Amino acid sequence: MLDRLQAVENRYEKLNELLSDPEVISDTNKLREYSKEQSDIQDTVEVYREYKDVREQLRDAKAMLEDKLDADMRDMVKEEVSELEGQEKTLSERLKILLVPKDPNDDKNVIVEVRGAAGGDEAALFAGDLYRMYSRYAEVQGWKTEIIEASYTELGGYKEIIFMINGKGAFAKLKFENGAHRVQRVPETESGGRIHTSTATVAVLPEAEEVEINIHEKDVRVDTFASSGPGGQSVNTTMSAVRLTHLPTGVVVSCQDEKSQIKNKEKAMKVLRARVYDKFRQEAQAEYDQNRKQAVGTGDRSERIRTYNFPQNRVTDHRIGLTIQKLDQILQGKLDDFINALVMEDQAQKMEAAE
């Protein structure tokens, strides 16, 4: 571990030199790249330097115990040794976590896609519950939510809703929401009072910047059409809705939320870039993980990850076996218990894999 930490510190010092180089300063892309790399390892370097300082103090204190000391001084030094050993252990544990490979997408904004799946109208209503849950969670975090595209049902649910959450660290916290969410409840339209089971799927994509994935205009087919509202009726006579097709991958994105065709195209392009980037990211991850099954999935959207049981006010995350008896609060956006547990489980697995 110490060799790895020393290599990180050496790289940090090298980056300091590079960021002072006029050639780098004049190159916007290199400056951004090196600044981000330095920022990513800064905490590790600071804790490592503190760790080295504590170890040096500990060596000096232990060396003092080899000298002839009176009883009071020996007790003082022993107390100092005990305190320094505690600090050394704490810093060592922090360094183990800091050395866990960081997902380069963690700090990014996210595009979230929620779709009603099995269960018809009830699944669409549940998709609306999930959208509001994530919106409220984002609000608590101080993040901004913006709807990109929504396909409504007559009962007020969503066949599909795509929205962006802007905020640092959004992907780090929300990436574990990928998958199938199951709901068990008595539908409002059910006169017999029977519990129905429905599902909605959630996809969380990191926003892709133009420098990360270059989509050429010639590779995108643009189709325009009239926007439609609930039930499919036309809501305007202008061709403001936009459909983009990325020809090399077959990825298709539509947007009709704005009255302006230009704004719809801009929003659709954000989603298209994120989906194409995510497709390549998933393929690379699948190849890397083909012989290793991760317990905390962040990619398989067919995986049933969570059940929301309304009669028992209970939510269960099946990946980590965590059940919480406060469904009402969770749907109000109080997701920290689940998100923190999933992040900790992911870190523990990565630490184990790194050993």
Curated annotation (Swiss-Prot):
SMART domains associated with the record: PCRF
A single Gene Ontology CC term: cytoplasm
Primary location group: cytoplasm
GO molecular function: translation release factor activity, codon specific
Pfam family, one: PCRF
Top-rank taxon, per record: Bacteria
Keyword list, A-Z: Cytoplasm, Methylation, Protein biosynthesis
Family per similarity comment: Belongs to the prokaryotic/mitochondrial release factor family.
Protein's UniProt name: Peptide chain release factor 1
Organism: Bacillus mycoides (strain KBAB4) (Bacillus weihenstephanensis)
Gene: prfA
